[in-house]
Amino acid sequence: MTNIRKTHPLLKIVNSSFVDLPAPSSLSSWWNFGSLLGICLGVQILTGLFLAMHYTSDTATAFNSVTHICRDVNYGWLLRYLHANGASMFFICLYLHVGRGLYYGSYTYSETWNIGILLLFAVMATAFMGYVPPWGQMSFWGATVITNLLSAIPYIGTDLVQWIWGGFSVDKATLTRFFAFHFLLPFIVTALVMVHLLFLHETGSNNPTGIPSDPDMIPFHPYYTIKDILGFLVMLTALATLVLFSPDLLGDPDNYIPANPSTTPPHIKPEWYFLFAYAILRSIPNKLGGVLALVMSILILAIVPILHTSKQRSMMFRPLSQCLFWLLVAVLFTLTWIGGQPVEHPYIIIGQTASVLYFLIILFLMPMTSMVENYLLKW
């Protein structure tokens, strides 16, 4: 008798995706982050759902409802901090996942890569909107500053900003719609994840060598299920440690002050995972130029497949490209640091230098280095 998991209309989809899926035998721990992102998404949706049961999206009561969740709801503090720090873990895994794709040339699967970029934008939008509901000082001013950037769009900018705000400033209407979208977007993200996996399973996984692995495949279960479970344990231990020992480590103290439109915080800055893009935005004195640079800092990933000039897919055997890749990582760390600093000397010039380097490495240095490596291969 044939196993039910191979014949049942629903189970056979699960079976072909997570059990009998042929996977390359050489996958390293860098391939764990896809499943870790799935766990993060699950944790965020569950904790968010329970938080939404006690939260009120009204400017008069929003801040107090979050306080009520932390003080009066059973394990409400745990839900709140799991949700806030879960977002940080989500972005850590997300950036490592994208970095893995860049290093090992996974971007040559263009459909999977482009859906991934859409996912990145969707998750960033979700996280930005999720920063507003606590209705603290940084929630209010962060929303005001970032949405106000859209006013740089010629002709329609001002109308667009007022349309998003639902008035002439960030107020009750803005909070309500941001909360509604913050609730809705994770489900759209889940749908996009399924499309992402669909395209991935059309081609099969890449591997560290970048060489086709068709002759040497192993079943996903039990080999990679066990490997993924180890990843889950490591990540959930890190998340639990963060939540239980220093839940406010990555947050902003200003968000414990209720939103006040008449008092501006000394340093308006987004959450740490947006600081690199914020630094690129601030490094350009022109408003429209800054907004374009901000969008391009992420959208540049879409042209990475076009810029691939190497005869090898992966960077595993390309030491010159490896040096550039790790320089890019250092530049991103520098931008993240600069994004959290005040706009004054010497931070301005450091931020501008790092921003130029970021685009220079991706657009020019990496393709040129790949061509040099191709030439060296002839020797």
UniProtKB/Swiss-Prot annotation:
Q: Give the transmembrane region(s).
A: 33-53, 77-98, 113-133, 178-198, 226-246, 288-308, 320-340, 347-367
What GO molecular function annotation could you give as one example from this UniProt entry?
Answer: metal ion binding
Q: Where in the cell is it found?
A: Mitochondrion inner membrane
Q: Which GO terms describe its biological process?
A: mitochondrial electron transport, ubiquinol to cytochrome c
Q: Where does heme b b566 bind?
A: H97, H196
Its record classes its membrane topology as: Multi-pass membrane protein
| Cofactor(s) listed | heme b
How the protein assembles, per its UniProt entry?
A: The cytochrome bc1 complex contains 11 subunits: 3 respiratory subunits (MT-CYB, CYC1 and UQCRFS1), 2 core proteins (UQCRC1 and UQCRC2) and 6 low-molecular weight proteins (UQCRH/QCR6, UQCRB/QCR7, UQCRQ/QCR8, UQCR10/QCR9, UQCR11/QCR10 and a cleavage product of UQCRFS1). This cytochrome bc1 complex then forms a dimer.
The entry's protein name is Cytochrome b
> Whose protein is this, by species?
Artibeus anderseni
